[in-house]
């Protein structure tokens, strides 16, 4: 009973935090405070660009060179349901759907409080566990307790070994060129990274998506990207004037035609 009460009290802040996440109805104009997030994943969406007289400037990333207005800039709609963030490319039919990891930059102060409460929650579980073990030891013989301790030690060692092997299998050290088996993943999120393209004589072809039309080598393909793949988080870092980190989902994306019918032509800059 005591353990249940502790769990309930310490879980309240986490539940409030989950409830606090704002919903975002389907819209073509996401809030200005979220533009940096959406334009990181959906750099080709029209709401990321300010186009005048055929010249488009990026609204978020000032170091992005102006580009000519063409079919690369697509109409998009976005929406968010707590942990699910999605944007649709509506310029083509059927609409292409992309799922991304939801932003959390608007809750920095609250996350610090939640982390403290989560620590207290963990310590509360430890306390309840110790009370239960002490109560069990008091009612059992010494031999039974020793057997229990041996089993716990064996279980702990096996779990650490399995965890270590899992981390080693999933770990991808920082590098400028990700493993070939992961190119589809990285080039879906970081499609402007140089390792996604094979450029010769000013013409660049996509290494992963064969249906991607060749494009002229220009400032869109200008980033030296470094990738980091940890067990539960994936990052890529764009090296252009200033290092810029971006987080993404680690799951392998479903193959789709993310550029088909969007690049009918490519104007040389």
Curated annotation (Swiss-Prot):
Induction: Expressed in the immediate early phase of the viral replicative cycle.
Sequence ranges on the Cytoplasmic membrane side: 1, 138-144
Compartments, record wording: Host membrane
Keywords: Early protein, Glycoprotein, Host membrane, Membrane, Repeat, Transmembrane, Transmembrane helix
UniProt cross-references to InterPro entries, sorted A to Z: ASFV_fam_110
Main location: host cell
One GO term describing the cellular component: membrane
Keyword Lyase: no
Residue ranges that the UniProt entry lists as topological domain Extracellular: 19-116, 166-269
Record bears the keyword Transmembrane helix: yes
Membrane topology of this protein: Multi-pass membrane protein
Transmembrane stretches, start-end: 2-18, 117-137, 145-165
Glycosylated residue positions: 75
Coiled-coil annotated spans: none
B repeats: 147-269
Top-level lineage group: Viruses
Segments annotated as A repeats: 1-145
Function: Plays a role in virus cell tropism, and may be required for efficient virus replication in macrophages.
Family, similarity comment: Belongs to the asfivirus MGF 110 family.
Name of protein: Protein MGF 110-1L
Native organism taxonomy: Viruses, Varidnaviria, Bamfordvirae, Nucleocytoviricota, Pokkesviricetes
